[in-house]
């Protein structure tokens, strides 16, 4: 059953490749006799070679319909996404030759998606750095627009972000670091010094002050209060200047 499956897959791949080049009649049946002879000679080596032939036949190089550069199916999709996202003029599809007006990449992925699954495993291709940056900038622009337009969804997004942070230990460590910095900044903030009049109002009079005040005249008491006020003002200014310089 496996050998019949590989034989039929190889035949279908070769027919597709021949149809692309316009030589269906010349290429019909080519490779079938070779596969059968290899199956009779040896099993394991035949399977490896058959897989390589199938992969080569399944992924033929096709030309870009806009700049005519040769690519396989995977790299062609990456090339169209990066260099030809929206083309104004009509161009034929390099696979089915149907005339496509704008989005060639969407047509290939929707109409010819079977090409990515025809082999035993799908080929992986690296996304170019410029394409990755363009996708990232597009996501950032979308997030910015949602932040500007979606006023009613801000609370929901903040709740979702808080849930994601609590679920991710790395993000939660960042959150703890920010909270620690916030608490340190609060501790370094200058402490407001109360007014001198409020100090006099809140602080009860000491007994020795009452004895001194009783032994002084009214003018001397007024002079001592003035001196104490000047000293308090000077100390207050000195403390504030020291805090602001730090």
Curated annotation (Swiss-Prot):
It holds the Pfam family Di19_C. Residues 185-230 are annotated as: Disordered. InterPro entries: DI19, Di19_C, Di19_Zn-bd. Residues 218-229 have a biased composition (Basic and acidic residues). Belongs to the Di19 family. PANTHER family: PROTEIN DEHYDRATION-INDUCED 19, PROTEIN DEHYDRATION-INDUCED 19 HOMOLOG 3. This is Protein DEHYDRATION-INDUCED 19 homolog 3. It comes from Oryza sativa subsp. japonica (Rice).
């Amino acid at each position: 059953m496996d050998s019949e499956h590989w034989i039929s897959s190889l035949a279908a791949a070769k027919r597709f490749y021949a149809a692309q080049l316009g030589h269906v009649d010349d290429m019909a049946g080519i490779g079938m006799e070779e596969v059968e002879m290899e199956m009779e000679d040896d099993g394991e080596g035949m399977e490896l070679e058959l897989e390589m032939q199938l992969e080569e036949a399944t992924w033929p190089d096709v030309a870009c319909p806009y700049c005519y550069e040769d690519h396989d199916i995977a790299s062609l999709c990456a090339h169209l996404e990066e260099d030809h996202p929206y083309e104004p003029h009509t161009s034929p599809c390099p696979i089915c030759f149907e005339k496509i007006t704008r989005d060639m990449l969407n047509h290939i992925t929707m109409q010819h998606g079977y090409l990515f699954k025809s082999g035993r495993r799908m080929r992986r291709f690296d996304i170019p750095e410029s394409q990755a940056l363009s996708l990232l900038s597009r996501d950032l622009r979308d997030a910015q627009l949602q932040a500007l337009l979606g006023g009613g969804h801000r609370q929901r997004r903040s709740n979702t972000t808080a849930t994601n942070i609590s679920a991710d230990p790395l993000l939660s460590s960042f959150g703890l670091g920010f909270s620690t910095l916030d608490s340190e900044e609060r501790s370094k903030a200058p402490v407001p010094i109360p007014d001198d009049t409020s100090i006099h109002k809140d602080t009860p009079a000491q007994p020795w002050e009452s004895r001194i005040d009783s032994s002084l005249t009214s003018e001397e008491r007024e002079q001592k209060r003035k001196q104490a006020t000047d000293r308090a003002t000077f100390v207050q200014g000195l403390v504030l200047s020291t805090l602001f310089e730090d």
